[in-house]
Amino acid sequence: MTVYATVDSPLGELVLTGEESATAAGGTALVSLSLPGQQGAAEARNGRRLAPGAFEEIAEQLRAYFSGELTCFSIEFAPGAGTDFQRRVWRAVEEIPYGRTASYGRIAERVGAAGAGVRAVGTAIGRNPLLVVRPCHRVIGADGALRGYAGGLPSKEWLLGLEGALAP
């Protein structure tokens, strides 16, 4: 069964959706985490059951992250989202350390799609359903400029500032 909950954050109310899982902490594997006003955000109430308790562990990790106490999430993601290429890109994004950034070109190189593949990498990153916890906010332009973010550039800038990843 698909469940959802909302969690207050410095970025506004986050919407978490998940699937029941026997192996995940709290019994729920995360399907999506959406920011307020996000392009392609999950519709929380359409056919989903409100279950705040199902996300207690995830909510606690988010609170610790937003207060600067957590630098690496330990969350089970529901399987099956994305194409093979998107999943390769998302795994590469997950490897970017807290407080660091990587360019779209660097991610393209890591997944074997250098050159023209940079645009495809950008598209795959734009389809990441797990904002914040799968840190696509850490991907920037080759020139160091902040580029697109489904949650909006102000949120991306705020997250990078929290992590100390913005150049002075």
Task: Label each residue range with its predicted role.
Residues V133:
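Major-groove DNA-recognition helix of helix-turn-helix-type DNA-binding domains
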Residues I96-G99:
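Short helix/strand-capping hinge loops at secondary-structure junctions
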Residues A113-A116:
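Feature detects long, helix-prone N-terminal segments enriched in hydrophobes
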Residues M1-S74, G141-P168:
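Low-complexity, small/basic-enriched stretches
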Residues G82, Q86-W90, V118:
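Short, leucine-enriched amphipathic alpha-helices that occur as contiguous helical runs
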Residues E109:
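Alpha-helical residues within the helix-turn-helix
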